């Protein structure tokens, strides 16, 4: 589960600009749910070698009603889940009643809050920050997100320490969780109302989860351990459900954050798609996020029953076009969660994907496969010399990491890297799991000796003179 930074504040203070700076505008996950008037942005960022999630919460106002009230609740969910809150205000326009409203909400939470005074370019920083100390938060810092002024200092000063502390604690906790983990841990992800809860009940064989037609009405992710044919599992239904005891509550708490964290905490991710609605940009965002995080993947296309043959052909063509990047290594099952059609095959693919993601490969086998790949198709020339791959070994599991050492590997083209991935995947029969390749430049064992010899020869020549 990643460290989470929530960017909050009233509208038009520069939250999205700061989001883009922290994430380098890359891999933004934008979700546009039915009944939601504004997109939400979730991004992955990195500080040193540590990953963290950033959420741009949208504007919070005391006048939020209707859909805006829904979005305000989403912002409060983000605050509740956050490890660190960047409360962004406008240093140019000064303190407003809207800022005071957001501050009052944050004071009710036991959260680490940094008041980020934005848009201070051309103004005196100390003067711009002064009035915002009245909120009662100790940490106040001035930046210009648009010009990247002080943004690196912001993360160095306020993010570095809590991020490192979090991952020190998380590593110890994660080791304990792995020891206590009940079998294969898999999550069901997808848009609200695609049938995840029905599929959960079908997999469990009982009505453990109450199903609702209204999208986005969830209290929390539901985690349930169970056993099937001697294999232990833990299933996580990430959204679209409410626990039986909470039926009377009307909280609309669909949390994308919960979904992203469930993906990171799973061995295998089952992406559930509604066959009648087709695959959406949001589905693709979740699938990309799972792959980027190295998660084994299975695709379940639900509500397949009752569709005409013509519609089924159209759905399959649409899937092939939009999921081309999966390179046919992910199993796709056309199911009916309601009637149980093909659900058993989903379990088979979960087992296969988990086994492949954790397959043990020796250094000898990895090197042998690399040599076979090179014999079949040599790396390209770089100038007068050919890129040389020397040996390979396994660098990790879930996902499998193959580390290849050689000369000039930094200049290896992406096309050859894809060739190696396909070669290893076919040779090892990897299904459902991404494969991560790392390329490392081999050290020249004679470099120091050569330099030393050059120095010795230089000394001798001086003595001769």
Curated annotation (Swiss-Prot):
Q: What range(s) does the KH-like domain occupy? A: 359-443
Q: Name one GO molecular function term.
A: ribosome binding
Q: Which domain of life is it from?
A: Bacteria
* One Pfam family matching this protein: KH_dom-like
Q: Which residues bind GTP 1?
A: 9-16, 56-60, 118-121
Annotated InterPro entries:
G_ENGA, GTP-bd, GTPase_Der, KH_dom-like, KH_dom-like_a/b, P-loop_NTPase, Small_GTP-bd
Task: Please name the GO terms of the biological process aspect recorded for this protein, alphabetically.
Answer: ribosome biogenesis
Keywords in UniProt for this one? GTP-binding, Nucleotide-binding, Repeat, Ribosome biogenesis
Annotated EngA-type G domain ranges read: 3-166, 184-358
Q: Where is this region: Disordered?
A: 446-465
This protein's record includes keyword Heme: no
**Which residues are listed for GTP 2 binding in this entry?**
190-197, 237-241, 302-305
General function of this protein = GTPase that plays an essential role in the late steps of ribosome biogenesis.
NCBIfam families in the cross-refs? GTPase_EngA (TIGR03594), small_GTP (TIGR00231)
Which family is this protein grouped under? Belongs to the TRAFAC class TrmE-Era-EngA-EngB-Septin-like GTPase superfamily. EngA (Der) GTPase family.
Query: Per its UniProt record, what HAMAP family does this chain match?
Result: GTPase_Der
- Subunit structure, interactors included: Associates with the 50S ribosomal subunit.
Q: Indicate what this protein is called per its UniProt record.
A: GTPase Der
Underlying gene: der
